[in-house]
Curated annotation (Swiss-Prot):
Annotated Pfam families: CPSase_sm_chain, GATase
Positions of the catalytic residues: 269 (nucleophile), 353, 355
UniProt-recorded name of the protein: Carbamoyl phosphate synthase small chain
Stretches for region CPSase: 1-189
Natural source organism: Escherichia coli O6:H1 (strain CFT073 / ATCC 700928 / UPEC)
Length: 382
């Protein structure tokens, strides 16, 4: 039986469609993502916590879902908005169709709406709070009330909500077409000990670090610098994550203490913003953020352009950078800051997602730079 669904934005705009997920309601910030593939990775990316994701590509669900493509242990997106759900999921790796997957994870989703109109609206007016109601006779007045009651992501610390409860180790490398997901590597195969802060870490980021010889100890977001330094790491990684970086004072304080040492530090996405804040810069909320797999970014030092995956609603304000932070990357879409490097410490960060899950691998050499800094640190400091 086909059930109705309704998406209402805080400005009162309504989109009527059909429910393809769980019955109920979902409230969050409505954003759009321009990736053509990777919907399962997007849904399970912790960076989408408290957000309703609109996918601009018209056909979503073609290849079904599977366990190997999940970026975390659960779906973090608050809700999903798509144009069309194919009748058949066809792929040799498919184990469950998208609609069943959404229902199993209790995710409210809507299909058969004009996603182009919605995307234009979000682009022109900026990201808006919204509410999806799925079920019999969805109440538009109730949906509008819920949308307007949502406080928004400004000032919202979500990293401590999505982080791991306990530290754990990670030694599994990347998926391959012929072998699938590999077995965990032995410790003697991984010469570098890296402590990774989990602010909402994606599995593929961890796998790409393991591919380069890193034995990872994943720690909760609120782990103190003292506890991490006792682990005697070769490097410290600051993961991606959701929400506003400014309220994460616990992380900023820890990073400032790391910067008093010579241990290499590498940040991605939220980790990039936190490194900037710890260095004295400021962050700003973007109009509608960057969400997609085709964003051109210029490496200003090498004068080359890379196509990157992006997923962030906040950015580092370049005008606030202190003298000891140099700009390494800038967005060619809007000129926003994409990369920084400390001039006095082996610490750097990148706003996009170089692990590219989903997306291109142009920025993957950033991981190699991290390893080079680790090797230099081991030679001089250990």
């Amino acid at each position: 039986m086909i059930k109705s669904a309704l998406l209402v934005l805080e400005d009162g705009t309504q989109f009527h469609g059909r429910a393809i997920g769980a019955t109920g309601s979902a409230v969050g910030e409505v954003v759009f993502n321009t990736s053509m593939t990777g919907y399962q990775e997007i849904l399970t990316d912790p960076s989408y916590s408290r957000q309703i994701v609109t996918l601009t590509y018209p056909h979503i669900g073609n290849v079904g879902t599977n366990d190997a493509d999940e970026e975390s242990s659960q779906v973090h997106a608050q809700g999903l908005v798509i144009r069309d759900l194919p009748l058949i999921a066809s792929n040799f790796r498919n184990t469950e169709d998208l609609s069943s997957y959404l229902k199993r994870h209790n995710i409210v989703a809507i299909a058969d709406i004009d996603t182009r109109k919605l995307t234009r609206l979000l682009r022109e007016k900026g990201a808006q709070n919204g509410c999806i109601i799925a079920g019999d006779n969805p109440d538009a007045a109730l949906a509008l009330e819920k949308a307007r009651a949502f406080p928004g992501l400004n000032g919202m610390d979500l990293a401590k909500e999505v982080t791991t409860a306990e530290p754990y180790s990670w030694t599994q490398g990347s998926w391959t077409l012929t072998g699938g997901l590999p077995e965990a590597k032995k410790e003697d195969e991984l010469p570098y000990h890296v402590v990774a802060y989990d602010f909402g870490a994606k599995r593929n980021i961890l796998r790409m670090l393991v591919d380069r010889g890193c034995r990872l100890t994943i720690v909760p977001a609120q782990t103190s610098a003292e506890d991490v330094l006792k682990m005697n790491p070769d490097g410290i990684f600051l993961s991606n994550g959701p929400g506003d970086p400014a309220p994460c004072d616990y992380a900023i304080t820890a990073i400032q203490k790391f910067l008093e040492t010579d241990i290499p530090v590498f940040g991605i996405c939220l980790g990039h913003q936190l490194l900037a804040l710890a260095s004295g810069a400021k962050t700003v909320k973007m109009k509608f953020g960057h969400h997609g797999g085709n964003h051109p970014v210029k490496d200003v030092e090498k004068n080359v352009v890379m196509i990157t995956a992006q997923n962030h609603g906040f950015a580092v304000d370049e005008a606030t950078l202190p003298a000891n932070l140099r700009v390494t990357h800038k967005s060619l879409f809007d000129g926003t800051l994409q990369g920084i490097h400390r001039t006095d410490k082996p610490a750097f960060s990148f706003q996009g997602h170089p692990e590219a899950s989903p997306g291109p691998h142009d920025a993957a050499p950033l991981f190699d730079h991290f390893i080079a800094l680790i090797e230099q640190y081991r030679k001089t400091a250990k």
